[in-house]
């Protein structure tokens, strides 16, 4: 069999960025396996932004004349318009987003000018940079969504006021706490997620552009200028690391998985609280669903989907880590598999978070039901033990005495507060009638006024600190977004000069 010399079958056809050393094109099976446009096309805006910065770097180094630079930038503007409008889409012949866009650029600028843009860069440093740009933009979106969720939880905490609920350990009654305290306990992990996103961005704020395939470039292009044009603080310190590192992707996937876990824990409680057995919350009709056969059902689908999707986020992280664990330096094609998992995690959270926040903002709490259940399960026993300690009884003895008191109440089928003075004395002479001063849920909550405690005064302080921290994180995120937007505006503005 002779090999085809038809240019349409060669690897170097439009839409592919390689092929000169091959006598023929790839097999259809390889083409199908290699094609990535079904997921990397969403990087097209970032690819075009990178091409603008690269064109300016080529011009600064003398590889494009002023006229060519201007024509190239104008062609890239036209390319961007065609992508945005849908006039240009990836075709079956395009291996990836880079090849599809080069094909589109050559249609606009011609092959001679369009073909000059590839000098001094590789798909390896391109894709490493574009993924960072995509993730940084979507990190900002998710950051803003998380802030809205924290705001919704904080607003519910403020509205709860002094409402008391059963606090639990091992899902058993433990001690009474303020509902506001419990809701704020879900805010702080989300605040740490916000901080993780900010910490991550500091490490992601490095441009691999200029690293080439792995060893850098001989063309003397200003990688620092490209980095600044694309909104990065600096360029990569090591060209091999620049093209091969994906820890920044894995770390981002971890942060999103952790967000999913934090949502899942809150979801589990909402699902329980929404049952008749608990009866703590009522879901808004707008944020719940019904049954196709049982007319009475009102299901907590958002919470259940959040709980389920947390497993998906964990799976995406696990798959990505498994892909990375055995790769030698530098770039390997395995790294094509880094994008779909993290893209899926981004898209999952960006759909989930608005619905979840709406569910939280519209929850109605049955605080009477919560207060009714708060003293059950002998939840004031620790208050009795600590009262004894304050009256100079060793805690070991106080614990034993209180345990006997619980046993006595349990045997009579009553609560601690229902025991008579004779019942108290029968357990221990230390249990004088004055112990009743701690046998109320209001007194128990108010007495826990140490740092981080559930007393109203401490919870109000905590909520104020939460508001301050979130405002600080929001301001930092807004400032970072403004810096990136200014860099992008400055870079794109040159095309119209």
UniProtKB/Swiss-Prot annotation:
Query: Which reactions fall under this protein's catalytic activity?
Result: 2-(N(omega)-L-arginino)succinate = fumarate + L-arginine
Q: Which domain of life is it from?
A: Bacteria
EC no. given is 4.3.2.1
Q: In which pathway does it act?
A: Amino-acid biosynthesis; L-arginine biosynthesis; L-arginine from L-ornithine and carbamoyl phosphate: step 3/3
Keyword list, A-Z: Amino-acid biosynthesis, Arginine biosynthesis, Cytoplasm, Lyase
- Name a Pfam family for this protein: ASL_C2
* GO molecular function (one): argininosuccinate lyase activity
Gene Ontology CC terms: cytosol
Q: Where in the cell is it found?
A: Cytoplasm
Instruction: Name the InterPro entries on file.
Output: Arg_succ_lyase_C, Argininosuccinate_lyase, Fumarase/histidase_N, Fumarate_lyase_CS, Fumarate_lyase_fam, Fumarate_lyase_N, L-Aspartase-like
What are its GO biological-process terms?
arginine biosynthetic process via ornithine; L-arginine biosynthetic process
Question: What family does this chain come from, according to its entry?
Answer: Belongs to the lyase 1 family. Argininosuccinate lyase subfamily.
The record's section on NCBIfam families has: argH
**What name has this protein been given in UniProt?**
Argininosuccinate lyase
């Amino acid at each position: 069999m002779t090999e085809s010399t038809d240019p349409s079958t060669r690897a170097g056809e439009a839409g592919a960025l390689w092929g000169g050393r091959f006598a023929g094109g790839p097999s259809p099976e390889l083409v199908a396996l290699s094609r990535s446009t079904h997921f990397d096309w969403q990087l097209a805006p970032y690819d075009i932004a990178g091409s603008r910065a690269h064109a300016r770097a080529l011009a600064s180094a003398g590889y494009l004349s002023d006229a060519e630079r201007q024509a190239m930038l104008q062609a890239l503007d036209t390319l961007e318009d065609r992508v945005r409008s849908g006039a240009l889409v990836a075709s079956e012949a395009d291996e990836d987003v880079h090849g599809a866009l080069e094909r589109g650029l050559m249609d606009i600028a011609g092959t001679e000018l369009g073909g000059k843009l590839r000098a001094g860069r590789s798909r390896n440093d391109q894709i490493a940079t574009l993924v960072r740009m995509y993730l940084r933009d979507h990190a900002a979106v998710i950051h803003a969504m998380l802030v809205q969720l924290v705001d919704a939880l904080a607003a519910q905490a403020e509205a709860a006021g002094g409402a008391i609920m059963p606090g639990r350990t091992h899902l058993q009654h433990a001690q009474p706490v303020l509902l506001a305290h419990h809701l704020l306990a879900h805010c702080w992990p989300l605040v740490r997620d916000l901080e993780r996103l900010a910490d991550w961005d500091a490490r992601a704020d490095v441009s691999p552009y200029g690293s080439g395939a792995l060893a850098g470039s001989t063309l003397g292009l200003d990688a620092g200028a490209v980095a600044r044009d694309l909104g990065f603080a600096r360029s990569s310190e090591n060209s091999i690391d620049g093209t091969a590192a994906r820890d920044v992707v894995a770390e981002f996937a971890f942060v999103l998985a952790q967000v999913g876990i934090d949502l899942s824990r809150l979801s589990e409680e909402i699902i329980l609280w929404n049952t008749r057995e608990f009866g703590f919350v009522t879901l808004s009709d707008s944020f719940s669903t019904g049954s196709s056969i049982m007319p009475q059902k009102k299901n907590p689908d958002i919470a259940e989907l959040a709980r389920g999707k947390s497993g998906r986020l964990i799976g995406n992280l696990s798959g990505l880590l498994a892909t990375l664990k055995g790769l030698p330096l530098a770039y390997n094609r395995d790294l094509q598999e880094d994008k779909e998992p993290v893209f899926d995690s981004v898209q999952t959270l960006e759909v989930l978070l608005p619905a979840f926040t709406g569910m939280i903002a519209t929850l109605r709490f049955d605080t009477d039901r919560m207060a009714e259940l708060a003293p059950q399960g002998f939840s004031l026993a620790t208050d009795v033990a600590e009262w004894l300690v304050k009256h100079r009884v060793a805690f070991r003895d106080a614990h034993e005495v209180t345990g006997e008191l619980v046993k006595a109440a349990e045997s009579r089928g009553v609560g601690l507060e229902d025991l008579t003075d004779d019942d108290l004395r029968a357990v221990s002479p230390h249990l004088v009638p004055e112990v009743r001063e701690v046998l109320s849920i209001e007194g128990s909550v108010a007495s826990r006024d140490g740092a981080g405690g559930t007393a109203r005064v401490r919870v109000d302080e905590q909520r104020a600190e939460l508001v301050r921290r979130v405002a600080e994180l929001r301001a930092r995120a807004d400032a970072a977004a403004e810096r990136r937007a200014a860099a992008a505006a400055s870079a794109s503005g040159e095309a119209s000069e």
